[in-house]
Curated annotation (Swiss-Prot):
Cofactor: pyridoxal 5'-phosphate
One MF term in the entry's GO annotations: aromatic-amino-acid transaminase activity
Gene: swnA
Keyword Transferase: yes
Pathway membership: Mycotoxin biosynthesis
UniProt-listed Enzyme Commission number(s): 2.6.1.-
Stated name of the protein: Aminotransferase swnA
Family in the record: Belongs to the class-I pyridoxal-phosphate-dependent aminotransferase family.
Mutant lacking the gene: phenotype: Impairs the production of 1-oxoindolizidine, (1S)-1-hydroxyindolizin, and (1R)-1-hydroxyindolizine and completely abolishes the production of swainsonine.
Pfam entry (one): Aminotran_1_2
UniProt KW keywords: Aminotransferase, Pyridoxal phosphate, Transferase
Origin species: Metarhizium robertsii (strain ARSEF 23 / ATCC MYA-3075) (Metarhizium anisopliae (strain ARSEF 23))
Amino acid sequence: MHLERDKVYDAPEGEVWSTVKPASTHNSAAPKRLAQRWNHRWSDESLTQGVSPLKDSSKTVKASTTIPLGTGRPTALYYPWQSVSMAGTEASRQPRGLKPTLAGNMTCSKGEAAFDLSSALNYGEPSGWSQLVAFFRETTGRVHRPPYADWDTTLTCGSTSAVDLVLRMFCNRGDCVLAERFTYPGTLMASRAQGLRTVGIAMDADGLVPEALDAALRGWDAASRGRKPFVLYTIPSGHNPTGVTQSAARKRAVYQVAERHDLLIVEDDPYFFLRLGRGGGGESLPTSYLSLDTAGRVVRVESTSKILAPGLRCGWLTASRQVVDMFGNFAEVGPSSPAGPSQAMLYKLLVESWGPEGFAGWLDYLSGEYGRRRDVMVAACERHLPREVCAWTAPTHGMFLWVGAALERHPRYQESGARDQDRDADADAELCRAVEDGICARAEANGVLVARGSWCRVGGGADRAFFRMTFVATAEAADLERGVAQFGRAVRDEFGLG
């Protein structure tokens, strides 16, 4: 089976994604508009980026009668693998908490009609193997229902790689990128490596604050700060590191600001499917920016890392056809596509074994397991963390708990004697780092690792020390209790609470 680009995976009839609340109000009977063009926003690198002539010419080597003397692809006769076998998990829609059972073996062989191992071991298309792309395109269409006509989906080598390429596509050295006040450190590192500056936008309990975003753009001084930023990077569900999930109303307000200032929204959403509920139960999937996007100004980035396995190094990206095509040009001379064996594993599991129903069932199961672990960690925090110093909010999506420690309760802060209006911001930032270092050193000495909030902070200033704790990384849920207890002891020692 080889599906052409514009075709979709032939999913079974029935509503698989029954927990999805459609965000788009677009009349499905009315024609959808085409996405806006982004020629005015391409980076200098994009303007000089073309299609690799060697790789482009190899696409024509399809017919068995063609003698491929111009390619650099060795014949499959000399690949030492004849077949690859794997055992997967049986997943279906079932009561939450019921552990999936072991499924039968899945085999990918040379010459196989559905997914030829010879093809998986050869150079692949930058967009990924069509059968697998079709599955993710179909999933995207059913879940998000993009309300414009010319959207498309491509595979990526994971979210970090995808975001790095998107920044290269739109930004020049010296440009500024907008992001939440706290954000994923990998994106901060990628931005710095490209010579970009990240501008932090205020957050509240619903995530990114649209009024703060609008104010930052309205008051932008191009003479002193360079050209006005037009790329907004956001992690809307189970935000890394804060755990916050943006409400549908919040996303609509942010999207309106994006329309007003002609922003491109990079929606990095690896935790979208991990809905934990407020008491261990499931919730509907969040409204996505993609589902609100009527003009093709959203680049949605998703990943298999948090829902299947990080080592697959595979994700998928959805955007307008123009943006997806440019992404493919960058991928051809960069990371290319995910490794063929990874794609074969995904195809055998998602398409041949699970299908959409099984995939949805697996995500239900995973969400239930993560929700229970979240509850264990939150309960441990209630028992072991000093409330007079620490604050946290149980996340409804994702895998992180964000704990803040009030600096004004620290002995060094109180010893300074300065009133709030007289405090030195640099001194407070230094104290914040010292408190983080002290707590982390004590915790590590007792065998517990937590992530420092300063690694995720955009810009300076601090009135709290923050720590990110993951509740899905331990093999045993009981380790969460012991880990939080040791972390709580480290906080008490650092703040002199005995």
